Amino acid sequence: MRLKSIITVIALILIMFMSAIESSIISLALPTIKQDLNAGNLISLIFTAYFIALVIANPIVGELLSRFKIIYVAIAGLLLFSIGSFMCGLSTNFTMLIISRVIQGFGSGVLMSLSQIVPKLAFEIPLRYKIMGIVGSVWGISSIIGPLLGGGILEFATWHWLFYINIPIAIIAIILVIWTFHFPEEETVAKSKFDTKGLTLFYVFIGLIMFALLNQQLLLLNFLSFILAIVVAMCLFKVEKHVSSPFLPVVEFNRSITLVFITDLLTAICLMGFNLYIPVYLQEQLGLSPLQSGLVIFPLSVAWITLNFNLHRIEAKLSRKVIYLLSFTLLLVSSIIISFGIKLPVLIAFVLILAGLSFGYIYTKDSVIVQEETSPLQMKKMMSFYGLTKNLGASIGSTIMGYLYAIQSGIFGPNLHNVLSAVAVISIGLIVLWVVFFKEQSSQSKE
Protein backbone atom coordinates (compact mmCIF):
# COMPACT_ATOMS: atom_id res chain seq x y z
CA MET A 1 0.00 0.00 0.00
CA ARG A 2 1.00 3.60 -0.58
CA LEU A 3 1.82 5.82 2.41
CA LYS A 4 -1.46 7.72 2.08
CA SER A 5 -3.43 4.46 2.17
CA ILE A 6 -1.58 3.33 5.29
CA ILE A 7 -2.29 6.66 7.00
CA THR A 8 -5.97 6.37 6.01
CA VAL A 9 -6.14 2.94 7.66
CA ILE A 10 -4.49 4.28 10.83
CA ALA A 11 -7.01 7.14 10.93
CA LEU A 12 -9.90 4.66 10.60
CA ILE A 13 -8.46 2.46 13.36
CA LEU A 14 -8.14 5.44 15.72
CA ILE A 15 -11.67 6.59 14.87
CA MET A 16 -13.11 3.14 15.55
CA PHE A 17 -10.97 2.59 18.64
CA MET A 18 -12.29 5.71 20.37
CA SER A 19 -15.89 4.65 19.76
CA ALA A 20 -15.34 0.97 20.53
CA ILE A 21 -13.41 1.31 23.78
CA GLU A 22 -15.92 3.62 25.49
CA SER A 23 -18.09 0.95 27.10
CA SER A 24 -15.33 -1.38 28.30
CA ILE A 25 -13.11 1.36 29.71
CA ILE A 26 -15.89 3.32 31.46
CA SER A 27 -17.61 0.29 33.00
CA LEU A 28 -14.69 -0.24 35.40
CA ALA A 29 -15.22 3.20 36.94
CA LEU A 30 -19.00 3.00 37.41
CA PRO A 31 -18.88 2.31 41.18
CA THR A 32 -16.53 5.26 41.73
CA ILE A 33 -18.52 7.62 39.49
CA LYS A 34 -21.75 6.54 41.20
CA GLN A 35 -20.30 7.42 44.60
CA ASP A 36 -18.51 10.65 43.59
CA LEU A 37 -21.47 12.16 41.72
CA ASN A 38 -24.21 10.66 43.91
CA ALA A 39 -25.85 9.06 40.86
CA GLY A 40 -27.72 6.31 42.67
CA ASN A 41 -29.91 4.11 40.46
CA LEU A 42 -29.54 6.56 37.55
CA ILE A 43 -25.96 5.43 36.89
CA SER A 44 -27.05 3.43 33.81
CA LEU A 45 -27.87 6.76 32.11
CA ILE A 46 -24.15 7.03 31.39
CA PHE A 47 -24.61 4.37 28.71
CA THR A 48 -28.23 5.11 27.79
CA ALA A 49 -27.59 8.80 27.02
CA TYR A 50 -24.53 7.91 24.95
CA PHE A 51 -26.40 5.29 22.94
CA ILE A 52 -29.45 7.49 22.28
CA ALA A 53 -27.22 10.28 20.96
CA LEU A 54 -25.31 7.79 18.82
CA VAL A 55 -28.52 6.44 17.26
CA ILE A 56 -29.79 9.96 16.58
CA ALA A 57 -26.52 10.94 14.88
CA ASN A 58 -26.10 7.80 12.75
CA PRO A 59 -28.71 8.47 10.04
CA ILE A 60 -28.15 12.23 9.78
CA VAL A 61 -24.52 11.60 8.77
CA GLY A 62 -25.61 10.33 5.36
CA GLU A 63 -27.56 13.54 4.76
CA LEU A 64 -24.57 15.64 5.81
CA LEU A 65 -22.23 13.69 3.54
CA SER A 66 -24.53 14.31 0.59
CA ARG A 67 -24.03 18.04 1.14
CA PHE A 68 -20.51 18.43 2.55
CA LYS A 69 -17.13 16.84 1.89
CA ILE A 70 -16.33 13.88 4.09
CA ILE A 71 -13.25 15.60 5.54
CA TYR A 72 -15.40 18.34 7.11
CA VAL A 73 -17.91 15.88 8.55
CA ALA A 74 -15.08 13.74 9.95
CA ILE A 75 -13.43 16.71 11.65
CA ALA A 76 -16.79 17.82 13.06
CA GLY A 77 -17.37 14.33 14.48
CA LEU A 78 -13.91 14.19 16.05
CA LEU A 79 -14.35 17.66 17.56
CA LEU A 80 -17.74 16.73 19.02
CA PHE A 81 -16.30 13.55 20.50
CA SER A 82 -13.29 15.45 21.91
CA ILE A 83 -15.41 18.25 23.40
CA GLY A 84 -17.77 15.69 24.92
CA SER A 85 -14.85 13.74 26.39
CA PHE A 86 -13.29 16.90 27.82
CA MET A 87 -16.59 17.95 29.39
CA CYS A 88 -17.06 14.44 30.85
CA GLY A 89 -13.66 14.77 32.50
CA LEU A 90 -14.58 18.18 33.91
CA SER A 91 -17.97 17.03 35.23
CA THR A 92 -18.60 17.86 38.87
CA ASN A 93 -22.19 16.61 38.97
CA PHE A 94 -24.16 13.83 37.32
CA THR A 95 -26.30 16.14 35.17
CA MET A 96 -23.23 17.68 33.55
CA LEU A 97 -21.80 14.21 32.95
CA ILE A 98 -24.96 13.04 31.16
CA ILE A 99 -25.07 16.17 28.96
CA SER A 100 -21.41 15.60 28.13
CA ARG A 101 -22.09 11.96 27.27
CA VAL A 102 -24.80 13.07 24.84
CA ILE A 103 -22.31 15.34 23.05
CA GLN A 104 -19.78 12.51 23.03
CA GLY A 105 -22.42 10.14 21.65
CA PHE A 106 -23.23 12.51 18.78
CA GLY A 107 -19.56 12.53 17.84
CA SER A 108 -19.34 8.75 18.10
CA GLY A 109 -22.37 8.36 15.82
CA VAL A 110 -20.61 10.39 13.14
CA LEU A 111 -17.34 8.46 13.53
CA MET A 112 -18.96 5.03 13.35
CA SER A 113 -20.76 5.91 10.12
CA LEU A 114 -17.49 7.12 8.57
CA SER A 115 -15.83 3.78 9.30
CA GLN A 116 -18.34 2.16 6.91
CA ILE A 117 -18.14 4.79 4.15
CA VAL A 118 -14.43 5.69 3.89
CA PRO A 119 -13.27 2.17 2.86
CA LYS A 120 -15.56 2.33 -0.19
CA LEU A 121 -14.08 5.68 -1.27
CA ALA A 122 -10.45 4.81 -0.49
CA PHE A 123 -9.95 1.15 -1.43
CA GLU A 124 -10.88 -1.33 -4.14
CA ILE A 125 -11.79 -4.98 -3.60
CA PRO A 126 -10.00 -7.22 -2.48
CA LEU A 127 -7.91 -4.74 -0.45
CA ARG A 128 -11.14 -3.27 0.92
CA TYR A 129 -12.03 -6.63 2.47
CA LYS A 130 -8.75 -6.64 4.40
CA ILE A 131 -9.11 -3.05 5.56
CA MET A 132 -12.68 -3.59 6.72
CA GLY A 133 -11.59 -6.73 8.55
CA ILE A 134 -8.90 -4.80 10.40
CA VAL A 135 -11.22 -1.91 11.24
CA GLY A 136 -14.09 -4.22 12.21
CA SER A 137 -11.89 -6.27 14.54
CA VAL A 138 -11.09 -3.16 16.58
CA TRP A 139 -14.28 -3.88 18.56
CA GLY A 140 -12.99 -7.23 19.72
CA ILE A 141 -9.49 -5.98 20.46
CA SER A 142 -10.87 -3.07 22.48
CA SER A 143 -12.64 -5.55 24.77
CA ILE A 144 -9.17 -6.66 25.90
CA ILE A 145 -7.37 -3.33 25.86
CA GLY A 146 -10.28 -1.50 27.55
CA PRO A 147 -10.12 -3.23 30.95
CA LEU A 148 -6.31 -3.24 30.87
CA LEU A 149 -6.04 0.46 29.99
CA GLY A 150 -8.89 1.47 32.28
CA GLY A 151 -7.47 -0.49 35.20
CA GLY A 152 -4.05 1.06 34.67
CA ILE A 153 -5.45 4.59 34.59
CA LEU A 154 -7.58 4.04 37.70
CA GLU A 155 -4.55 2.66 39.50
CA PHE A 156 -2.70 5.98 39.21
CA ALA A 157 -5.40 8.61 38.49
CA THR A 158 -9.08 9.45 38.97
CA TRP A 159 -11.93 8.34 36.68
CA HIS A 160 -11.84 11.73 34.94
CA TRP A 161 -8.75 10.61 33.03
CA LEU A 162 -10.71 7.79 31.40
CA PHE A 163 -12.31 10.55 29.34
CA TYR A 164 -9.26 12.79 28.95
CA ILE A 165 -7.36 9.92 27.29
CA ASN A 166 -9.55 10.35 24.21
CA ILE A 167 -8.33 13.88 23.51
CA PRO A 168 -4.75 13.17 22.33
CA ILE A 169 -6.04 10.26 20.23
CA ALA A 170 -8.64 12.55 18.63
CA ILE A 171 -6.01 15.22 17.90
CA ILE A 172 -3.84 12.65 16.10
CA ALA A 173 -6.90 11.40 14.19
CA ILE A 174 -7.80 14.96 13.10
CA ILE A 175 -4.29 15.50 11.74
CA LEU A 176 -4.43 12.22 9.80
CA VAL A 177 -7.92 13.01 8.48
CA ILE A 178 -6.78 16.42 7.20
CA TRP A 179 -3.86 14.68 5.49
CA THR A 180 -5.67 11.76 3.85
CA PHE A 181 -9.46 12.21 3.60
CA HIS A 182 -9.44 13.63 0.07
CA PHE A 183 -11.32 11.39 -2.37
CA PRO A 184 -11.60 12.33 -6.09
CA GLU A 185 -14.75 10.22 -6.63
CA GLU A 186 -16.63 11.82 -3.74
CA GLU A 187 -19.93 13.35 -4.84
CA THR A 188 -22.20 15.84 -3.08
CA VAL A 189 -25.67 17.05 -4.05
CA ALA A 190 -25.81 20.20 -1.94
CA LYS A 191 -28.43 21.90 -4.14
CA SER A 192 -31.17 19.38 -3.37
CA LYS A 193 -34.04 20.36 -1.08
CA PHE A 194 -33.84 19.08 2.49
CA ASP A 195 -36.44 16.38 3.19
CA THR A 196 -37.89 17.74 6.44
CA LYS A 197 -41.00 15.53 6.41
CA GLY A 198 -38.99 12.35 5.88
CA LEU A 199 -36.53 13.26 8.62
CA THR A 200 -39.35 14.01 11.09
CA LEU A 201 -41.20 10.76 10.39
CA PHE A 202 -37.98 8.76 10.60
CA TYR A 203 -37.02 10.12 14.01
CA VAL A 204 -40.55 9.60 15.31
CA PHE A 205 -40.18 5.97 14.19
CA ILE A 206 -36.77 5.65 15.89
CA GLY A 207 -38.10 7.33 19.04
CA LEU A 208 -40.94 4.82 19.30
CA ILE A 209 -38.60 1.88 18.77
CA MET A 210 -36.13 3.14 21.38
CA PHE A 211 -38.91 3.80 23.89
CA ALA A 212 -40.11 0.23 23.45
CA LEU A 213 -36.57 -1.03 24.01
CA LEU A 214 -35.71 1.11 27.03
CA ASN A 215 -39.04 1.27 28.88
CA GLN A 216 -39.20 -1.28 31.70
CA GLN A 217 -42.34 -0.10 33.49
CA LEU A 218 -45.52 -0.91 31.54
CA LEU A 219 -45.15 -3.63 28.92
CA LEU A 220 -48.43 -2.54 27.34
CA LEU A 221 -46.79 0.77 26.41
CA ASN A 222 -44.00 -1.16 24.69
CA PHE A 223 -46.54 -3.06 22.61
CA LEU A 224 -48.37 0.15 21.67
CA SER A 225 -45.06 1.77 20.74
CA PHE A 226 -44.23 -1.06 18.35
CA ILE A 227 -47.69 -0.79 16.74
CA LEU A 228 -47.31 2.98 16.32
CA ALA A 229 -43.80 2.45 14.94
CA ILE A 230 -45.19 0.16 12.24
CA VAL A 231 -47.83 2.76 11.30
CA VAL A 232 -45.21 5.54 11.15
CA ALA A 233 -42.91 3.29 9.08
CA MET A 234 -45.70 2.76 6.53
CA CYS A 235 -46.29 6.52 6.32
CA LEU A 236 -42.55 7.11 5.96
CA PHE A 237 -42.29 4.59 3.12
CA LYS A 238 -45.21 6.20 1.30
CA VAL A 239 -43.80 9.74 1.67
CA GLU A 240 -40.21 8.87 0.72
CA LYS A 241 -41.22 7.10 -2.50
CA HIS A 242 -42.32 10.44 -3.95
CA VAL A 243 -39.42 12.68 -2.83
CA SER A 244 -36.66 13.52 -5.33
CA SER A 245 -33.92 13.52 -2.67
CA PRO A 246 -35.36 11.51 0.25
CA PHE A 247 -33.87 11.41 3.73
CA LEU A 248 -34.42 7.63 3.66
CA PRO A 249 -33.92 6.32 0.08
CA VAL A 250 -36.59 3.60 0.22
CA VAL A 251 -36.26 2.85 -3.51
CA GLU A 252 -32.80 1.40 -2.78
CA PHE A 253 -34.28 -1.36 -0.63
CA ASN A 254 -34.54 -4.14 -3.21
CA ARG A 255 -34.69 -7.80 -2.18
CA SER A 256 -30.91 -8.13 -1.78
CA ILE A 257 -30.40 -4.94 0.25
CA THR A 258 -33.42 -5.63 2.48
CA LEU A 259 -32.11 -9.13 3.18
CA VAL A 260 -28.70 -7.70 4.09
CA PHE A 261 -30.20 -5.20 6.56
CA ILE A 262 -32.28 -7.92 8.25
CA THR A 263 -29.23 -10.20 8.36
CA ASP A 264 -27.08 -7.51 9.94
CA LEU A 265 -29.69 -6.67 12.57
CA LEU A 266 -30.00 -10.31 13.64
CA THR A 267 -26.25 -10.92 13.48
CA ALA A 268 -25.62 -7.90 15.72
CA ILE A 269 -27.95 -9.44 18.30
CA CYS A 270 -25.89 -12.65 18.21
CA LEU A 271 -22.60 -10.75 18.45
CA MET A 272 -23.80 -9.05 21.64
CA GLY A 273 -24.52 -12.47 23.09
CA PHE A 274 -20.92 -13.53 22.48
CA ASN A 275 -19.08 -10.27 23.18
CA LEU A 276 -21.01 -9.21 26.29
CA TYR A 277 -22.20 -12.32 28.07
CA ILE A 278 -19.49 -14.90 27.47
CA PRO A 279 -16.99 -12.59 29.29
CA VAL A 280 -19.58 -11.94 32.02
CA TYR A 281 -20.09 -15.69 32.44
CA LEU A 282 -16.34 -16.36 32.51
CA GLN A 283 -15.87 -13.78 35.25
CA GLU A 284 -18.96 -14.46 37.38
CA GLN A 285 -19.20 -18.25 37.09
CA LEU A 286 -15.65 -19.42 36.37
CA GLY A 287 -13.76 -16.75 38.32
CA LEU A 288 -11.63 -15.39 35.48
CA SER A 289 -10.31 -11.82 35.59
CA PRO A 290 -11.48 -9.21 33.03
CA LEU A 291 -8.18 -9.56 31.20
CA GLN A 292 -8.37 -13.38 31.15
CA SER A 293 -11.94 -13.34 29.85
CA GLY A 294 -10.87 -10.84 27.19
CA LEU A 295 -8.11 -13.21 26.08
CA VAL A 296 -10.65 -16.04 25.78
CA ILE A 297 -12.74 -13.85 23.46
CA PHE A 298 -9.69 -12.65 21.49
CA PRO A 299 -9.62 -15.58 18.98
CA LEU A 300 -12.93 -14.28 17.61
CA SER A 301 -11.19 -11.08 16.46
CA VAL A 302 -8.18 -12.97 15.08
CA ALA A 303 -10.44 -15.21 12.99
CA TRP A 304 -12.40 -12.14 11.87
CA ILE A 305 -9.26 -10.48 10.45
CA THR A 306 -7.89 -13.72 8.96
CA LEU A 307 -11.14 -14.42 7.11
CA ASN A 308 -11.19 -10.96 5.57
CA PHE A 309 -7.61 -11.27 4.33
CA ASN A 310 -8.65 -14.37 2.39
CA LEU A 311 -12.22 -13.48 1.50
CA HIS A 312 -11.57 -12.77 -2.19
CA ARG A 313 -10.09 -16.28 -2.60
CA ILE A 314 -13.13 -17.88 -0.98
CA GLU A 315 -15.50 -15.87 -3.17
CA ALA A 316 -13.66 -17.05 -6.27
CA LYS A 317 -14.71 -20.63 -5.45
CA LEU A 318 -18.10 -20.36 -3.75
CA SER A 319 -21.28 -18.42 -4.44
CA ARG A 320 -22.57 -15.70 -2.14
CA LYS A 321 -25.48 -17.83 -0.96
CA VAL A 322 -23.28 -20.81 -0.10
CA ILE A 323 -20.84 -18.69 1.92
CA TYR A 324 -23.64 -17.00 3.85
CA LEU A 325 -25.24 -20.36 4.65
CA LEU A 326 -21.86 -21.72 5.77
CA SER A 327 -21.40 -18.65 7.99
CA PHE A 328 -24.78 -19.12 9.66
CA THR A 329 -24.01 -22.83 10.12
CA LEU A 330 -20.67 -22.01 11.78
CA LEU A 331 -22.49 -19.67 14.16
CA LEU A 332 -25.01 -22.40 14.96
CA VAL A 333 -22.31 -25.03 15.50
CA SER A 334 -20.20 -22.74 17.70
CA SER A 335 -23.15 -21.96 19.98
CA ILE A 336 -23.94 -25.68 20.33
CA ILE A 337 -20.33 -26.73 21.06
CA ILE A 338 -19.85 -23.97 23.66
CA SER A 339 -23.06 -25.15 25.35
CA PHE A 340 -21.54 -28.61 25.83
CA GLY A 341 -18.11 -27.30 26.89
CA ILE A 342 -19.39 -24.43 28.96
CA LYS A 343 -16.94 -24.96 31.84
CA LEU A 344 -13.84 -25.18 29.61
CA PRO A 345 -12.39 -21.72 28.75
CA VAL A 346 -9.81 -23.24 26.38
CA LEU A 347 -12.54 -24.99 24.38
CA ILE A 348 -14.63 -21.80 24.33
CA ALA A 349 -11.64 -19.84 22.99
CA PHE A 350 -11.04 -22.43 20.26
CA VAL A 351 -14.69 -22.57 19.19
CA LEU A 352 -14.89 -18.77 19.05
CA ILE A 353 -12.62 -19.04 16.01
CA LEU A 354 -15.63 -20.51 14.17
CA ALA A 355 -17.83 -17.66 15.37
CA GLY A 356 -15.17 -15.14 14.30
CA LEU A 357 -15.10 -16.59 10.78
CA SER A 358 -18.89 -16.27 10.66
CA PHE A 359 -19.07 -12.70 11.95
CA GLY A 360 -16.11 -11.69 9.80
CA TYR A 361 -17.80 -12.72 6.58
CA ILE A 362 -21.32 -11.54 7.41
CA TYR A 363 -20.37 -8.07 8.62
CA THR A 364 -17.83 -7.36 5.90
CA LYS A 365 -19.87 -8.76 3.02
CA ASP A 366 -23.07 -7.06 4.20
CA SER A 367 -21.25 -3.74 4.20
CA VAL A 368 -19.71 -4.28 0.76
CA ILE A 369 -23.08 -5.31 -0.73
CA VAL A 370 -24.63 -2.04 0.45
CA GLN A 371 -21.61 -0.10 -0.85
CA GLU A 372 -21.65 -1.73 -4.28
CA GLU A 373 -25.34 -2.39 -4.97
CA THR A 374 -26.83 0.99 -4.10
CA SER A 375 -26.67 3.97 -6.44
CA PRO A 376 -23.51 6.13 -6.03
CA LEU A 377 -25.50 9.23 -5.04
CA GLN A 378 -27.32 7.35 -2.26
CA MET A 379 -24.44 5.17 -1.06
CA LYS A 380 -23.46 7.44 1.84
CA LYS A 381 -27.03 7.66 3.12
CA MET A 382 -27.51 3.92 2.82
CA MET A 383 -24.27 3.21 4.68
CA SER A 384 -25.38 5.55 7.47
CA PHE A 385 -28.66 3.64 7.81
CA TYR A 386 -26.70 0.40 7.64
CA GLY A 387 -24.63 1.60 10.61
CA LEU A 388 -27.82 2.51 12.44
CA THR A 389 -29.16 -1.01 11.83
CA LYS A 390 -26.06 -2.51 13.44
CA ASN A 391 -26.37 -0.21 16.45
CA LEU A 392 -30.06 -1.01 16.88
CA GLY A 393 -29.21 -4.70 16.63
CA ALA A 394 -26.55 -4.24 19.30
CA SER A 395 -29.04 -2.44 21.56
CA ILE A 396 -31.75 -5.06 21.04
CA GLY A 397 -29.14 -7.78 21.53
CA SER A 398 -27.80 -6.38 24.79
CA THR A 399 -31.37 -6.05 26.10
CA ILE A 400 -32.64 -9.48 25.01
CA MET A 401 -29.45 -11.35 25.86
CA GLY A 402 -29.26 -9.55 29.20
CA TYR A 403 -32.79 -10.66 30.03
CA LEU A 404 -32.01 -14.26 29.01
CA TYR A 405 -28.76 -14.27 30.97
CA ALA A 406 -30.59 -13.04 34.07
CA ILE A 407 -32.87 -16.10 33.99
CA GLN A 408 -31.54 -18.57 36.53
CA SER A 409 -30.83 -22.23 35.82
CA GLY A 410 -33.85 -24.14 34.61
CA ILE A 411 -34.79 -26.12 31.55
CA PHE A 412 -32.02 -24.33 29.65
CA GLY A 413 -29.33 -25.14 32.23
CA PRO A 414 -26.81 -22.45 33.32
CA ASN A 415 -27.83 -18.92 32.33
CA LEU A 416 -25.26 -18.69 29.50
CA HIS A 417 -27.11 -21.61 27.90
CA ASN A 418 -30.09 -19.30 27.47
CA VAL A 419 -27.96 -16.84 25.49
CA LEU A 420 -26.42 -19.60 23.37
CA SER A 421 -29.86 -21.08 22.70
CA ALA A 422 -31.03 -17.69 21.40
CA VAL A 423 -28.00 -17.49 19.11
CA ALA A 424 -28.76 -20.98 17.80
CA VAL A 425 -32.41 -20.08 17.10
CA ILE A 426 -31.41 -16.88 15.29
CA SER A 427 -28.82 -18.80 13.25
CA ILE A 428 -31.46 -21.30 12.14
CA GLY A 429 -33.78 -18.42 11.29
CA LEU A 430 -31.08 -16.81 9.14
CA ILE A 431 -30.48 -20.09 7.30
CA VAL A 432 -34.20 -20.38 6.52
CA LEU A 433 -34.37 -16.71 5.51
CA TRP A 434 -31.56 -17.05 2.97
CA VAL A 435 -32.78 -20.37 1.59
CA VAL A 436 -36.26 -18.97 1.00
CA PHE A 437 -35.66 -15.36 -0.03
CA PHE A 438 -32.22 -15.07 -1.62
CA LYS A 439 -32.06 -15.48 -5.38
CA GLU A 440 -28.61 -15.82 -6.91
CA GLN A 441 -27.92 -13.52 -9.82
CA SER A 442 -25.41 -14.41 -12.48
CA SER A 443 -23.21 -11.47 -11.49
CA GLN A 444 -23.11 -12.70 -7.91
CA SER A 445 -22.54 -16.34 -8.48
CA LYS A 446 -18.78 -16.17 -8.21
CA GLU A 447 -17.70 -13.00 -6.50
From Swiss-Prot:
One of its GO terms (biological process) is response to antibiotic. GO terms for cellular component: plasma membrane. Pfam families: MFS_1 (PF07690). Energy-dependent drug efflux pump that increases resistance to antimicrobial agents such as norfloxacin, acriflavine and ethidium bromide. It comes from Staphylococcus aureus (strain N315). NCBIfam families: MFS_effux_SdrM. It is found in: Cell membrane. The keyword Membrane applies. Keywords: Antibiotic resistance, Cell membrane, Membrane, Transmembrane, Transmembrane helix, Transport. The chain crosses the membrane at residues 6-26, 42-62, 70-90, 94-114, 134-154, 161-181, 194-214, 217-237, 260-280, 286-306, 323-342, 346-363, 392-412, 418-438. Belongs to the major facilitator superfamily. GO terms for molecular function: transmembrane transporter activity. This is Multidrug efflux pump SdrM. Induction: Not expressed constitutively. It is a multi-pass membrane protein. Its main location: membrane.
